[in-house]
């Protein structure tokens, strides 16, 4: 009985060391992303990209509908890229500090929902910024691109939630 108890204790301490290592890793990545985000803000220039709304107006003279783009906002691009990094920093700091106990509890179940929430925000922001680089400046398109990408990431969370107690991985979340 002593050997079983000793094996359990050594595997528990190995698991605890692994979680402590992940905590330290998240702290390190949090600081790295924070420094990168601050650096990005410091070195970014005043480049902006426009965001427009595009509605149709009826032209009485020509009896036709004509686009009527209206500038809504000038997005400071460097700051927006820095936000991508700062979102990651916040997520890493959360996991290493106030969210650590929940993080460990979820990892033991084979889940990491914070990852998908962070991805839903940060990767959606980055996809929107890439779209803006190639001329997607319509507010409606930007909102939809963000929403579709965020939804795809949240399906990853749904997949982990559904598969935490299954023998075989169910990929249904990604079929939709």
Residue ranges and their predicted role:
Residues 1-7:
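N-terminal acidic, proline/glycine-rich, low-complexity intrinsically disordered segments
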Residues 123-176:
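Membrane-proximal helix-loop-helix units in multi-pass membrane proteins
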Residues 8-107, 113-119:
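N-terminal topogenic module of multi-pass integral membrane proteins
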Residues 2, 57-58, 110, 133-134, ...:
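General N-terminal targeting signals
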């Amino acid at each position: 009985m002593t050997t079983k108890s000793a094996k359990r204790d050594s595997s528990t301490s190995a698991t605890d060391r692994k979680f402590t290592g992940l905590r330290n890793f998240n702290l390190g990545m949090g600081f790295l992303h924070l420094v990168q985000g601050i650096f990005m803000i410091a070195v970014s220039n005043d480049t902006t990209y426009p965001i427009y709304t595009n509605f149709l107006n009826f032209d009485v003279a020509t009896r036709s509908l004509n686009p009527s783009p209206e500038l809504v906002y000038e997005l400071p691009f460097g700051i927006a890229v820095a936000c991508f990094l700062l979102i990651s920093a916040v997520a890493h700091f959360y996991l290493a500090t106030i969210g650590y106990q929940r993080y460990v509890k979820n990892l033991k179940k084979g889940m990491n929902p914070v990852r998908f929430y962070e991805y839903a925000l940060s990767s959606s922001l980055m996809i929107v910024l890439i779209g803006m680089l190639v001329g997607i400046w319509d507010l409606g398109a930007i909102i939809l691109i963000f929403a579709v990408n965020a939804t795809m990431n949240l399906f990853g969370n749904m997949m982990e939630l559904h598969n935490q107690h299954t023998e075989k991985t169910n990929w249904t979340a990604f079929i939709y």
